[in-house]
Amino acid sequence: VCMANTKPLVDNEETLRYVLEEGKKTGIHVLSCAAVSKGFKGEELTDMEGLLAAGAAGFTDDGIPLMDGPFVLKAMEEAARLDTVISFHEEDKSFIRENGINHGAVSDQLGIYGSPSLAEDSLVARDCMIALETGARIDVQHISSGYSVELVRLAKKLGADVWAEVTPHHFTLTEEAVLEHGTLAKMNPPLRTELDRQMLIAGLKDGTIDLIATDHAPHSKEEKDKPLTEAPSGIIGLETALSLGIEQLVKPGHLSLLELMEKMSLNPARLYKLDCGRICEGAPADLVIFDENETWTADQFASKASNTPFLGRSMTGKVKYTICEGKVVYQD
């Protein structure tokens, strides 16, 4: 499922149809969310009903936080009416001086302030309560703060239809990675502390965190070679996600392999109400065959970019075949 933060933005039916038509040429299923607000400005709602009819999987202004509370309330009311999902990028920029780097011990070493967990926690709290008020289905994207996990856990307990996702890099790495990998470990929200990482894993284990999503964000070498405070945030993640899930979650015993598949496949399908993500008679023959024990080196990517702190790392768990609608579209 692609996000709407493309050029041009997916905030109208024409652009959405273009993305979906181009996706059909890839050999795999490419879906797309549409924007919540026109121009990602957080001021005027897009035609959510029309975009849904045109094929939008859901709605998000991913990368740009929605700061106006009454606007968010209006958006959730419309989403509830249409029975669709809104995904939220939760970072209040008023608390952030330099994005992509956690405010903490590492930012202190670097002589910058960075991005505190409070920037995430404050918006997660707001949106969980608005979801509870409206009955809307929402997804807290790429959760990174342990306190935000606690807030989502409470919202679920209160009865809110709140879902949460975590990236492989957030459950694998901490802010210390910035000291080793520089801009290749810079992303929004940032890598946080070891305590946060452990709280993310605990959230995966008890079901507070429903999904694993990559937040795949390619950038050129030239962009990432800029100084830390000037380089863009974001890393690629599609090709390393499975291996990191196996290494960090399955091998240590945090999740079973079936539970990992639930977080990576079945639950995303449930969130977007898609008829996929499961293996049973009559289900779509969309399958990935992998060897959970085979090792490989993350040094060559199908992506045009290689901006990842896992570059050159030995990984465990290798995809052997990808099958879409019964056709082999990738073979190792």
Provide a role label for each language-model segment.
Residues 21, 43-212:
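Histidine/acidic residue-rich metal-binding segments in metalloenzymes
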Residues 1-23:
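Metal-associated gating/positioning segment near the N- to mid-region
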Residues 109-137, 184, 205-206, 210-212, ...:
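His/Asp/Glu-enriched, well-ordered alpha-helical/loop segment
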Residues 12-15, 28-29, 79-84, 161-163, ...:
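Short acidic, glycine/proline-enriched helix-loop-strand junctions
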Residues 227-230, 284-331:
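C-terminal cap of metal-dependent C-N hydrolases
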Residues 21-36:
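A glycine-rich helix N-cap at a beta->alpha junction
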